[in-house]
Amino acid sequence: MKPNIVLIMVDQMRGDCLGVNGNEFIETPNLDMMATEGYNFENAYTAVPSCIASRASILTGMSQKSHGRVGYEDGVSWNYENTIASEFSKAGYHTQCIGKMHVYPERNLCGFHNIMLHDGYLHFARNKEGKASTQIEQCDDYLKWFREKKGHNVDLIDIGLDCNSWVSRPWGYEENLHPTNWVVNESIDFLRRRDPSKPFFLKMSFVRPHSPLDPPKFYFDMYKDEDLPEPLMGDWANKEDEENRGKDINCVKGIINKKALKRAKAAYYGSITHIDHQIGRFLIALSEYGKLNNTIFLFVSDHGDMMGDHNWFRKGIPYEGSARVPFFIYDPGNLLKGKKGKVFDEVLELRDIMPTLLDFAHISIPDSVEGLSLKDLIEERNSTWRDYIHGEHSFGEDSNHYIVTKKDKFLWFSQRGEEQYFDLEKDPKELTNLINSEEYKERIDYLRKILIKELEGREEGYTDGNKLLKGYPVSTLKHIR
């Protein structure tokens, strides 16, 4: 039988928030084991670092220019002919997604046979006068289950935390009622009710560590009194709190009270450790069903979280905290016959997930897919790989583009004409902006030309073919609007 495939996706987890990736403060024993005994990719990026667009890259295997989502915009229909789920389904796999989809309409199966949905608290779906839904339970299976357990009046907002807030506190109910536990509950139940005559493709999609920052008390307490590192602060960072932005609990930039920020990081780390332990629970269950050694796992996040670095928060910007993600493959049965424990430095993007997993299952990759399969890299066959990724995000005054390679990164903020350059080999934390350095002038010019080439013909008018222009940012390109 073909291998089972499990795609484990978390939301808003930084690439540096794994012990195996050098973080000495966070405890991620199960994930560390999986990455150490598998194949770890240290230069994985999201081309559009926010929830919807990044999920489109994973779902379709396309670049942002092709799937059309270059910023954050709810309510735009998902009508893609070929998706990762549709290809597995057509190939005879039993396909299931549990957790966050963040598509529109919310119940769009996108090729899965079934979805058990919890997108978290989404303002768009909660708008009782909007077009999404006036009955939130219709698009949230977790909330329906939660109310069956605790009463029809309980709600996701009961503990007073917003879905983008830096305010944190422990989960207010029993640990086994947390959304993180629910994803694993339903994933284990899928093992019971799946078609045993077919291989399966399971997407386990956690809402955390995305806000609300509300891990169960045990996990919050693990970090609340720890001397966690201060946020990174580059020589280019704005040290002023413009218009008191840091007082906004949903701010994307500003200066936040140090005590509150420390609690936020404790809750963020606690949420990740909670996910780690629940993934360990799923591995035990899968082993009990006798399927562990015939299953290949891919773990990834949709984007990261700045968590106060350089006085930025959340995502949508091209810095490492926002754009670089954890990415590893775990193959306990050694089905891929690669050199387990290897760390790769190739530049990856989320569009590479679909062709990689289809390749693992010996399923044909549709012509619409622009990502690259990692199978040849893992099997150490001769293979060519891309030199760079072009990333972007429509974001008002902070709309941005970036070109990242193994060794450096060029950034351009289109609406204010600001450029930055970081030597990631010498400065992986992006502390020194070298845009005006004579030593790097030739390299900067080269990367700028690459960006100009990437933007030629775009509807926003970002270039005339010779230089970068301010343009008019949009969140979705016209071919999908």
Swiss-Prot record:
The keyword Calcium applies. One of its GO terms (molecular function) is metal ion binding. Keywords: Calcium, Hydrolase, Metal-binding. Its cofactor is Ca(2+). The keyword Calcium applies. Disulfide bonds: none annotated. Its EC number is 3.1.6.1. Belongs to the sulfatase family. Has sulfatase activity toward para-nitrophenyl sulfate, which is increased in presence of calcium ion. This is Arylsulfatase. It comes from Clostridium perfringens (strain 13 / Type A). The lineage of its organism: Bacteria, Bacillati, Bacillota, Clostridia, Eubacteriales.
